[in-house]
Amino acid sequence: MVKSSLQRILNSHCFAREKEGDKRSATLHASRTMPLLSQHSRGGCSSESSRVALNCCSNLGPGPRWCSDVPHPPLKIPGGRGNSQRDHSLSASILYSDERLNVTEEPTSNDKTRVLSIQSTLTEAKQVTWRAVWSGGGLYIELPAGPLPEGSKDSFAALLEFAEEQLQADHVFICFPKNREDRAALLRTFSFLGFEIVRPGHPLVPKRPDACFMVYTLEREDPGEED
């Protein structure tokens, strides 16, 4: 069901722009520009960091409580260096792995919320990593700022298949700021893929008037039904 929709990604407007992005590194880490999800591992994100870039998650209302305003040390960029910074990879455990995806889970203080790093292998020299939160049957993905990383079209397709087949997710949410210059293009692209705009006040997303949420509902066939 998802697979047929995912074929549309190959010719979608936004993903066609991906080659305009930064090609200086063979490994592309979407998490570098996604503070909303990358600040979660201790169950909180600082007020200061939540105002940087997306600013999607602070003082949450109903929905997955994947971050709060409790200050803590900043996130260390995966594979990077720095003093007094945290590196999630040191404590992450492998949740799922095949020839296309390597999914690791980071420990959190909330047993109902899981922080995932989903790495998609496109070629031997190229990988794309998405940061996500898995909570209450929904997978929440924060889109990186700027043009989507090169290879995103194939990587995102594999991610949605993983959500449906391995996580048995009910919904996949994406989040990005309303003031993005490419907002209209993102809305067209993901609407074409079957995503719908989430109306304000929806119980499954935080109250963020400055953020846009879209949802893909994964419908399953009743095993008792026959054609």
UniProtKB/Swiss-Prot annotation:
Family to which the UniProt record says this protein belongs: Belongs to the ODC antizyme family.
Domain of life: Eukaryota
Disulfide bonds: none
Protein name according to UniProt: Ornithine decarboxylase antizyme 1
Keywords: Polyamine biosynthesis, Transport
Positions in coiled-coil regions: none
GO BP, sorted A to Z: negative regulation of polyamine transmembrane transport; polyamine biosynthetic process; polyamine metabolic process; positive regulation of intracellular protein transport; positive regulation of protein catabolic process; viral translational frameshifting
One Pfam entry name: ODC_AZ
GO function terms (MF aspect): ornithine decarboxylase inhibitor activity
Gene3D superfamilies hit by this protein: 3.40.630.60
Function statement: Ornithine decarboxylase (ODC) antizyme protein that negatively regulates ODC activity and intracellular polyamine biosynthesis and uptake in response to increased intracellular polyamine levels. Binds to ODC monomers, inhibiting the assembly of the functional ODC homodimer, and targets the monomers for ubiquitin-independent proteolytic destruction by the 26S proteasome. Triggers ODC degradation by inducing the exposure of a cryptic proteasome-interacting surface of ODC. Stabilizes AZIN2 by interfering with its ubiquitination.
Subunit structure as annotated in this protein's UniProt entry: Interacts with ODC1 and thereby sterically blocks ODC homodimerization. Forms a ternary complex with PSMB4 and OAZ1 before PSMB4 is incorporated into the 20S proteasome. Interacts with AZIN2; this interaction disrupts the interaction between the antizyme and ODC1. Interacts with FAM171A1.
